[in-house]
Amino acid sequence: MENILTKKFTNGIYDHINIDDYHADREYLSSSSIKEAIKSLKHFRHYLDNNNNERKSHFDFGNAFELALMDVMNNTAEFDNEVLVFDETERPEVDKNFNSTLNKEWKAEIMDTKKYIINKVGLESVETMKLMLESCWQDETIQGLLKNTDYQKSLFWTDKETGLNLKTRPDVCKVNKCVVIDIKTCKDASPSGFGKDAANLNYPIQAVLQMRGCLETGLMSVINKYYW
């Protein structure tokens, strides 16, 4: 599904902007494009020319989990508004996989939405998400960090040294405490497992951009703590 930019952004702090508008913007560079530039300028150019925000199930699952987690912590209802739950067992031809024409058309209709799409059961599903939420709710540290926070502020600014227009979208900001939190979902949350993910996926690049965005836009005067 193609994203069409419906809002023109300028430097500043934005609340509750549409995620598709955020990603469709090409005037400002995000950490995703910077990660490609680290590989090479050819990777960077290819990303800018060909990035069509192809839907990936693990991105949908991660974003949907963030919404569910923040709903639990802050008594909101963003998950119901932003997430579509479907059941693969309800496909027209249950005895066939999604290579069949009917099943393929059925799934294509479901995918034609701006909402995050999550399966009812399976590995990346509502079933899995409920277990993760129960674990988080029982953790006092997580509760302390996530309750009464601002979720997904979008920050746009121009870097003074390079003149580049940059953007970032921290998951959680505790503005009064000058704390930034980026929620990550992973299969192995052990220190070594997460460390490998952080290195392989360049999490520090994203973290630096999030902290810099908070400072440059004036959202925070200092960053006291940053959490993954």
What are the residue ranges of the model-derived segments?
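Metal-dependent nuclease catalytic cores that hydrolyze phosphodiester bonds in DNA/RNA
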Residues: M1-K167
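Mg2+/Mn2+-dependent nuclease catalytic core
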Residues: K147, K153-W228
